[in-house]
């Protein structure tokens, strides 16, 4: 399978990329950390490709997509994983620029990637778009209102996209569950260590994603066993 993943430099995105590569799939990924991208390129040379791209910047995303589509063709799976969370605080104490950054990556970034890659998938007539949501995209918690708002938006955006896709394709909002990542540690501090590691999660999540297809179009999905 040809798989495009955003946010591959750490956490869930990196764990997914590593699992897919280890299991014979071709991965094209992006992330914001130049050193991490360099490491991925060194560790996983062609046919895999990794680029330093901020998904919040539509021109950069478009140029990246042109390169990937030119070498790889339309992906079988497009996984929008890149995301940010705000520093825990009551909504009225979250600075406007911080809220804006969360929205720019978590919502606009997803739209930028969809705009760049999905036309090629539609033209081919097949493919699955998986947009990572969250348990906080289906419930709420204090002090993470900006993050909750963006993940609720992803649920709606993905379900609307599902209504627009041709028969045979799918768009699925996916709740990955609660995993010990840098992002979770921003909220739970050392308490995050009690949750599964990203690599353990990927062993179940990566094949679960590959099992998603047209039958799942518009369905809110969750990775079994990690819903906590």
Stretches with model-predicted labels:
Residues 119, 163-164:
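Alpha-helical segment proximal to the catalytic Tyr-Lys
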Residues 89-91, 98-100:
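Substrate-binding pocket helix/loop in short-chain dehydrogenase/reductase
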Residues 134:
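Residue(s) in the substrate-gating loop at a strand-loop-helix junction
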Residues 114, 150:
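Active-site helix of classical SDR
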Residues 23-38:
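Conserved glycine-rich Rossmann-like NAD(P)H-binding loop of the short-chain dehydrogenase/reductase
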Residues 167-169, 173-176, 181, 190-228:
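C-terminal helical subdomain
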Residues 9-10:
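Conserved glycine-rich cofactor-binding loop
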């Amino acid at each position: 399978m040809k798989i495009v993943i955003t946010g591959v430099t750490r956490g869930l995105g990196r764990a997914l990329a590593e699992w897919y590569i280890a299991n014979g799939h071709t991965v094209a990924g992006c992330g914001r950390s130049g050193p991490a991208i360099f490491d991925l390129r060194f560790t996983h040379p062609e046919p895999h490709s990794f680029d330093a791209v901020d998904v919040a910047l539509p021109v950069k995303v478009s140029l990246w997509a042109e390169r990937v589509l030119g070498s790889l063709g339309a992906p079988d799976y497009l996984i929008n994983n890149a995301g940010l969370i705000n520093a825990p605080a009551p909504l009225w104490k979250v600075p406007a620029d911080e809220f804006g950054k969360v929205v720019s990556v978590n919502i606009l970034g997803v739209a930028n990637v969809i705009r760049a890659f999905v036309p090629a998938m539609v033209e081919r007539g097949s493919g699955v778009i998986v947009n990572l949501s969250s348990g906080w995209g289906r419930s709420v918690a204090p002090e993470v209102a900006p993050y909750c708002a963006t993940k609720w938006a992803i649920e709606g955006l993905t379900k609307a996209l599902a209504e627009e896709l041709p028969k045979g394709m799918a768009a699925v909002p996916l709740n990955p569950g609660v995993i010990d990542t840098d992002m979770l540690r921003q909220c739970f501090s050392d308490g995050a260590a009690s949750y599964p590691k990203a690599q353990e999660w990927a062993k179940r999540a990566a094949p679960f994603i590959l099992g998603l297809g047209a039958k799942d179009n518009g369905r809110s999905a969750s990775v079994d066993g990690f819903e906590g």
